[in-house]
């Protein structure tokens, strides 16, 4: 029986990553370096002979473009791809579009670290009059107003990512499918917290770099056995 494997990967560097801005739900494209990261990831995946049955990503183009590059470069563009807002980055509320260093100077390192890395703390809410509010984005027109976050903690992100894992992705793993998930720093932190049973206090130390394929191997009972970067 073949080993059950999933690759988790954060998108390549985005234009706002390069500018050190909070991005969240804003639909920002890749930099040249971000595209290069995706191509290098594809090279590693191909070198290690990973053949995928299915792929998942968010509805944000930095993740979608990264996935496209990987599938193209590994000659797997034909596999089924499913996109969901449930895999989006966490919503950074009123911080979206702002420079991280300027926010640190205004609020202090400790507060910004809590907003960025803690499990339960939310950034300030986004006002509905703000142009970055998701209500103005056509991608979310089918969602009800109460489903549109104006800010999210990692816990709130966890509460949308994990049901998607359990009801959409896990059934494919149970069928012995090899799966590729290209998502975002915090949607992946939420999933890794769940898979590794990481405590609320320890999750603050987990950071995920852009463009690095992380392999999870699972037992026949779908329990994580080990994980490693390619």
From Swiss-Prot:
Catalytic activity: (2R)-2-phosphoglycerate = (2R)-3-phosphoglycerate
Entry keywords, A to Z: Gluconeogenesis, Glycolysis, Isomerase
Enzyme active site: 11 (tele-phosphohistidine intermediate), 89 (proton donor/acceptor)
Record InterPro entries: His_Pase_superF_clade-1, His_PPase_superfam, PG/BPGM_mutase_AS, Phosphogly_mut1
Pathway: Carbohydrate degradation; glycolysis; pyruvate from D-glyceraldehyde 3-phosphate: step 3/5
A single MF term (Gene Ontology): phosphoglycerate mutase activity
Binding site for substrate: 10-17, 23-24, 62, 89-92, 100, 116-117, 185-186
Site keyed Transition state stabilizer: positions: 184
Keyword ATP-binding: no
EC number: 5.4.2.11
SUPFAM superfamilies in the cross-refs: Phosphoglycerate mutase-like (SSF53254)
Example GO biological process: gluconeogenesis
Function of the molecule: Catalyzes the interconversion of 2-phosphoglycerate and 3-phosphoglycerate.
Family the entry assigns: Belongs to the phosphoglycerate mutase family. BPG-dependent PGAM subfamily.
Subunit annotation: Homodimer.
Protein's recorded name: 2,3-bisphosphoglycerate-dependent phosphoglycerate mutase
High-level lineage: Bacteria, Pseudomonadati, Pseudomonadota, Gammaproteobacteria, Enterobacterales
């Amino acid at each position: 029986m073949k080993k059950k494997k999933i690759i988790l990967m954060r998108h390549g560097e985005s234009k706002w990553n390069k500018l050190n801005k909070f991005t969240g739900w804003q639909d920002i494209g890749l930099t040249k370096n971000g595209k290069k990261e995706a191509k290098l990831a594809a090279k590693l995946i191909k070198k290690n002979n990973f053949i995928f049955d299915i792929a998942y990503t968010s509805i944000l183009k930095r993740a979608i473009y990264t996935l496209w590059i990987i599938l193209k470069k590994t000659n797997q563009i034909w596999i089924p791809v499913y996109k969901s807002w449930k895999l989006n980055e966490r919503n950074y509320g009123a911080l979206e579009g702002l420079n991280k260093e300027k926010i640190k100077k205004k609020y202090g390192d400790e507060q910004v670290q809590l907003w960025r890395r803690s499990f339960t703390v939310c950034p300030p809410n986004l006002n509905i009059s703000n142009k970055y509010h998701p209500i103005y984005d056509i991608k979310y027109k089918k969602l009800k107003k109460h489903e549109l976050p104006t800010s999210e903690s990692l816990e709130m992100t966890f509460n949308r990512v994990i049901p998607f894992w359990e009801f959409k992705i896990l059934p494919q793993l149970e069928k012995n499918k090899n799966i590729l998930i290209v998502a975002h720093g915090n949607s992946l932190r939420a999933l890794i917290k769940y898979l590794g049973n990481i405590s609320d206090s320890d999750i603050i130390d987990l950071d995920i770099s852009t463009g690095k394929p992380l392999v999870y191997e699972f037992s026949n009972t779908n329990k994580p056995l080990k994980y490693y970067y390619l």
